[in-house]
Amino acid sequence: MKKDHYTGRLIASLVACLIPGYVALYLFTTSIPGWYSGLKKPDFVPSDDIVFYAIILIFCLLGLTLYTIWNAGLTHSEVRAAFLLFLFTLTLIVFWFISFFYLQAAFFALIVMLMAIAVMLCTLVQILRSAVNAAIFLVPCLIMMLIICYANLQIVLMNSGLPVWGIVA
């Protein structure tokens, strides 16, 4: 393949993941002054600035994962399966941001994050069968998601008065 083709794929992959990342950042930053700042959080939750950059890092790594899967050849059924699982994982991650920061549904977001982790593990297994290099970028995302999930659980436990399914109208 031509170098331009790879460059185009890299840009497309990063943009495809950074657009949902922008949505996640928007949801995070708009909830900081209100709901999120009022939550009791465990001591290991980093400052809002660090979380901001961690979100960017996660979505950049997801973009590199997508690029690597794409370059493995979507015509192969194993790679296509990894690609579809990856898209499902990306969708669940964005849905977690919507659930947690927009709907303010910490318990529901915890369920979504557990689902995202389960699908990401399936994605990782599929990637190891078809596009091994993509695992380099996906494993740090999985580690960050496990930390987020644990923080989410602690927030649910520390803020017992939160509505289970989100904002109460």
Task: Pin down the residues of each PLM region.
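N-terminal membrane topogenic signal
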Residues: M1-V15
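Membrane-interface helix-boundary motifs at transmembrane edges
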Residues: K2-H5, W70-R80, L128-I136
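Short aromatic-rich membrane-water interface segments that cap or initiate transmembrane helices
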Residues: K41-A54, A169
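Helix-adjacent hinge/juxtasegments
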Residues: C60, L64-F97
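Membrane-interface helix caps and helix-loop-helix hairpins in membrane proteins
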Residues: W96-F108, R129
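Terminal transmembrane helical module of multi-pass membrane proteins
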Residues: Q126-A169
